[in-house]
C-alpha cells in the first residue's frame, strides 16, 4: 500500500509540520498587523479659484496651478459674488497634489501604486430662486484636465496627462438656509482613477462650462467649495505586500515541482485531484509573481486590471478546487469510470464559471475603459450605478450561496464517512487503528478547508472595502485591515502548500509484518501491518487499483459497494 503522505506520515512528523505551518500563519498576521500601515491613505484638497483668459479657454494644453513660480492669482469668493456674471466660463478650480507639509513640498512615490479621485460639490441658489426641494440626479458637465510633472522639472513644467468632458449626476441635501442664498451639499462623485502612480506631482483643472442653447449647467446656481479627496495605496503596505509575495513565490514553485515529480514516478496517470492541485498551485504562483516591482521602473497603467485578472483566476481555481476536493471525498459515484470535470462537476461549476465571467466583464467595462480615459466610471450615471450595484450584490449573494453549498458537501462527506465507520469493529486492531487515524486526519483537513473558505470570503469583502477605510484613526497601533489581508494571503499559500505535501503520493513500500503485540507499534508500523491485509480491498471495481490516491477512498468505496 502506498497512498498519500497524509496517510503514511507518522504522528510526530505530522505534528511538527502542522505546528510549523501554524507558526507561519501567525507570522503573516503579525507582519501586516505590526509593520504594515493601512492599505490606503488619502489627502483632502480644497480647490483654489483662478480666473482664465478668454483667449486660452479652448487651449487644452493651457494649465493653471496654485503653487510655485508662475502660479495663478487666486480669486476670492467675494470677488466672484461681486461680479455681475459670477465670472461665468472664466473660473477654473485648481487642485495640486500632494499638499505640502511643514513648509516642505511632498511628492508621490511609485510604491503608492495608484490614485483615485472623488469630488464633493457644494453650490448655492439665491433665496429668490423658485427651487425649494433639494435637487436629485442633476446632470453636471465638467471639463477635466489632469497633468503631471516630476522632480527636477520647473514649476511650470506641467504636462497634460488626460483631458475629457464628462457628465456626473448629483444628489444633494440642504446644508444651509440664509437670508440671501441656500447652500446645497452633494454626495461624493467619482472623478478619476489612475492605475499607475508613476509621477511625482499631479494637477487637476476643473471647469464648469455654461451654455444657454444646450442648457449646459444652467440648472445650478453658482459653485461654492469643491473638495477633492485623492486616495492612494500606502507605500509601506505595498512594501510589506511585495515582501510577502517575494518570500512565498519560490516556496510554492519548489513544492509544485516536488509534487509533480512524485506523481510522475508512479506507474499510473495522475488522478483528477492531483491535476486540480497542480492547477491550483499554478494559479497561486501566477498570483504570487511580484510583477509590481516592474511598476517602480516602468509606467504600467494596466497594473490594476492585471492584478484583478490574476486574483480572479486564483479565486476561480480555488472555488473550483474546493468543489472537486469535497466531491472526490464524497465517494458516492456508482460507475467505475475515472472522474473528470466534465462528467461529474459541470453542474456544480457552471455557477462559478458564470459568476467569474460576469465579474470579468464588469471589470473590463470599468478598468479596461479607464486605460484610455481615466475619468470614466460606470458609477457616474444612475443606470450604471444600479447595474454596478446589482453586480456587486449578486457577487456577494453568490459567494454566500457557494459557501453554504460547500458546507453542505463537506457535511455529506462527514456523514458518509461516519456511516462507513460501522464496519471498523469487524477489522483487526491494526487495520482499525489505521483507518481511525486516517479519518481523524481527514476531518481535521476538511475543517481547515472550511475555515479557509470562510476567511477567503471575508477577505474578499474587506479587500473591496479597503479603499473606503481611509478615514480610520491613524493612531491605531495594530491595523486590523492590513493584518487581515496579509493573514488571508499567507493562509492561501500555507493551505495550498500543505495540500501539495499531504496529498503527494507516498513512496513507502511497507513489508508484510507478522507480530502479536500491535499495541506497541508506532503509527508507521500500524500502516505497515495494515498493508498485509490489503487483500480485503483488492477487488474494488475501480479503474485499476494503482489509480487510487487514498486508502481512505478505497475504504469508503469498498463498504459502499458491499
From Swiss-Prot:
Membrane topology category: Multi-pass membrane protein
Residue ranges that the UniProt entry lists as topological domain Lumenal: 35-239, 292-311, 366-390, 463-482
GO CC, alphabetical: cell projection; endoplasmic reticulum membrane; endosome membrane; Golgi membrane; neuromuscular junction; plasma membrane; postsynaptic membrane; presynaptic membrane
Alphabetical list of InterPro entries matching this protein: WLS-like_TM (IPR047843), WLS_GOLD (IPR053936), Wntless (IPR009551)
Segments traversing the membrane: 14-34, 240-260, 271-291, 312-332, 345-365, 391-411, 442-462, 483-503
Intracellular or extracellular location(s): Presynaptic cell membrane; Postsynaptic cell membrane; Cell membrane; Endoplasmic reticulum membrane
Residues exposed to the Cytoplasmic side: 1-13, 261-270, 333-344, 412-441, 504-562
Glycosylated residues (UniProt): 58
Biological process annotations from GO: imaginal disc-derived wing margin morphogenesis; intracellular protein transport; positive regulation of protein secretion; positive regulation of Wnt signaling pathway; regulation of intracellular protein transport; segment polarity determination; Wnt protein secretion; Wnt signaling pathway
Molecular-function GO term, any one: Wnt-protein binding
Keywords annotated in UniProt: Cell membrane, Cell projection, Developmental protein, Endoplasmic reticulum, Endosome, Glycoprotein, Golgi apparatus, Membrane, Postsynaptic cell membrane, Segmentation polarity protein, Synapse, Transmembrane, Transmembrane helix, Wnt signaling pathway
Superkingdom, taxonomy of origin: Eukaryota
Family under the similarity heading: Belongs to the wntless family.
Function as written in the Swiss-Prot or TrEMBL entry: A segment polarity gene required for wingless (wg)-dependent patterning processes, acting in both wg-sending cells and wg-target cells. In non-neuronal cells wls directs wg secretion. The wls traffic loop encompasses the Golgi, the cell surface, an endocytic compartment and a retrograde route leading back to the Golgi, and involves clathrin-mediated endocytosis and the retromer complex (a conserved protein complex consisting of Vps35 and Vps26). In neuronal cells (the larval motorneuron NMJ), the wg signal moves across the synapse via the release of wls-containing exosome-like vesicles.
Assembly mode: Interacts with wg; in the Golgi. Interacts with Vps35, a component of the retromer complex; wls stability is regulated by Vps35.
Protein name: Protein wntless
Organism phylogeny: Eukaryota, Metazoa, Ecdysozoa, Arthropoda, Hexapoda
Gene from which the chain derives: wls
Amino acid at each position: 500500500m502506498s497512498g498519500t503522505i497524509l496517510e503514511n506520515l507518522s504522528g510526530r512528523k505530522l505534528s511538527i509540520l502542522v505546528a510549523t505551518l501554524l507558526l507561519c500563519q501567525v507570522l503573516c498576521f503579525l507582519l501586516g498587523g505590526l509593520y504594515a500601515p493601512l492599505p490606503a491613505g488619502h489627502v483632502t484638497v480644497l480647490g483654489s479659484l483662478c480666473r482664465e483668459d478668454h483667449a486660452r479657454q479652448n487651449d487644452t494644453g493651457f494649465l493653471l496651478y496654485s503653487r510655485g513660480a508662475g502660479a495663478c492669482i487666486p480669486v476670492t469668493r467675494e470677488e466672484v459674488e461681486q461680479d455681475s456674471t459670477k465670472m461665468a466660463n472664466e473660473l477654473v478650480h485648481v487642485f495640486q497634489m500632494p499638499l505640502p507639509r511643514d513648509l516642505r513640498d511632498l511628492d508621490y512615490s511609485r510604491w503608492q501604486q495608484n490614485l483615485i479621485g472623488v469630488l464633493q460639490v457644494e453650490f448655492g441658489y439665491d433665496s429668490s430662486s423658485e427651487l425649494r426641494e433639494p435637487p436629485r440626479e442633476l446632470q453636471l458637465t465638467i471639463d477635466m484636465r489632469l497633468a503631471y510633472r516630476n522632480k527636477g522639472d520647473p514649476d511650470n513644467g506641467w504636462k497634460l496627462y488626460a483631458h475629457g468632458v464628462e457628465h456626473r449626476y448629483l444628489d444633494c441635501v440642504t446644508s444651509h438656509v440664509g437670508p440671501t442664498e441656500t447652500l446645497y451639499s452633494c454626495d461624493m462623485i467619482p472623478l478619476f482613477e489612475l492605475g499607475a502612480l508613476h509621477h511625482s506631482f499631479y494637477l487637476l483643472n476643473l471647469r464648469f462650462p455654461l451654455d444657454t442653447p444646450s442648457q449646459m449647467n444652467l440648472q445650478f446656481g453658482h459653485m461654492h467649495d469643491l473638495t477633492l479627496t485623492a486616495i492612494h495605496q500606502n507605500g509601506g503596505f505595498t512594501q510589506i505586500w511585495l515582501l510577502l509575495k517575494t518570500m512565498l513565490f519560490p516556496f510554492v514553485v519548489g513544492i509544485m515541482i516536488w509534487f509533480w515529480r512524485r506523481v510522475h514516478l508512479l506507474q499510473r496517470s495522475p488522478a483528477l485531484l492531483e491535476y486540480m492541485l497542480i492547477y491550483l498551485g499554478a494559479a497561486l504562483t501566477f498570483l504570487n509573481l511580484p510583477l509590481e516591482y516592474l511598476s517602480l521602473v516602468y509606467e504600467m497603467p494596466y497594473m490594476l486590471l492585471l492584478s484583478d485578472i490574476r486574483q480572479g483566476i486564483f479565486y476561480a481555481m480555488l472555488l473550483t478546487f474546493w468543489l472537486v476536493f469535497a466531491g472526490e471525498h464524497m465517494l458516492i459515484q456508482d460507475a467505475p469510470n475515472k472522474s473528470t470535470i466534465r462528467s461529474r462537476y459541470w453542474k456544480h461549476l457552471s455557477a462559478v464559471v458564470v459568476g467569474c465571467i460576469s465579474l470579468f466583464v464588469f471589470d473590463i467595462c470599468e478598468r479596461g475603459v479607464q486605460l484610455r480615459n481615466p475619468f470614466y466610471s460606470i458609477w457616474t450615471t444612475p443606470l450604471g450605478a444600479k447595474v454596478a450595484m446589482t453586480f456587486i450584490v449578486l457577487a456577494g449573494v453568490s459567494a454566500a450561496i457557494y459557501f453554504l453549498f460547500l458546507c453542505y458537501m463537506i457535511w455529506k462527506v462527514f456523514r458518509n464517512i461516519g456511516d462507513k465507520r460501522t464496519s471498523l469493529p469487524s477489522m483487526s486492531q491494526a487495520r482499525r487503528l489505521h483507518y481511525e487515524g486516517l479519518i481523524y486526519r481527514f476531518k481535521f483537513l476538511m475543517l481547515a478547508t472550511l475555515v479557509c473558505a470562510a476567511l477567503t470570503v471575508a477577505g474578499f469583502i474587506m479587500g473591496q472595502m479597503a479603499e473606503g477605510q481611509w478615514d480610520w484613526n491613524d493612531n491605531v497601533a495594530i491595523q486590523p485591515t492590513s493584518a487581515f489581508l496579509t493573514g488571508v494571503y499567507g493562509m492561501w499559500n500555507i493551505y495550498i502548500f500543505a495540500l501539495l505535501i499531504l496529498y503527494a503520493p507516498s513512496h513507502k513500500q511497507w513489508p508484510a509484518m507478522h507480530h502479536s503485540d500491535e499495541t506497541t507499534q508506532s503509527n508507521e508500523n500500524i500502516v505497515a501491518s495494515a498493508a498485509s491485509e490489503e487483500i480485503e480491498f483488492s477487488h474494488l471495481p475501480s479503474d485499476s487499483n494503482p489509480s487510487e490516491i487514498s486508502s481512505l477512498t478505497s475504504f469508503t468505496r469498498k463498504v459502499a459497494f458491499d
